[in-house]
Curated annotation (Swiss-Prot):
Protein name: Fatty acid binding protein 1-A, liver
Organism: Danio rerio
Compartments reported by the entry: Cytoplasm
SUPFAM superfamilies: Lipocalins
Keyword field: Cytoplasm, Lipid-binding, Transport
GO cellular component: cytosol; nucleus
GO biological process: fatty acid transport
Amino acid sequence: MAFTGKYQLESHENFEAFMKAVGVPDDEVEKGKDIKSISEIHQDGKDFKVTVTAGTKVILYSFTVGEECELETFTGDRAKTVVQMDGNKLTAFVKGIESVTELDGDTISNTLSFNGIVYKRISRRIS
C-alpha cells in the first residue's frame, strides 16, 4: 500500500508538552496547538516528496528510503537522518527524536518520542 495521498490532522495527543520539550517557543506552541495541518505525500517506490501545510507555514522535504537526507525539525533547524521503511512503517531519528509513521488504510499515525515524552498524531486521507 502506497503512502501517496493528502491527509488532514484529525487528532493529536501531548502536543504542548512535546513541543516545549524539543525547544519550540511558547508562543509558537500556543499558535500551533489548534491547527489542523494538511500533509501531501507522493511516493514513488523508495522516493518520497512531502508537503506539510500548517496554517501559513509550508514545509517541503524529500527523501529516499535508506539514504541520508536533511529534514526540518520542529524548531526550524535542518538535521541529517536516514529514513527506514518496513512494510507500511517509516522510522527516522532526528536530533534525539524518534519518529514512527505508520499507514493503516486511510489513516496515518505518527508517534514521536523525545526524552520519554510521546506525541501522537492521527491523520486521515482526504484525497
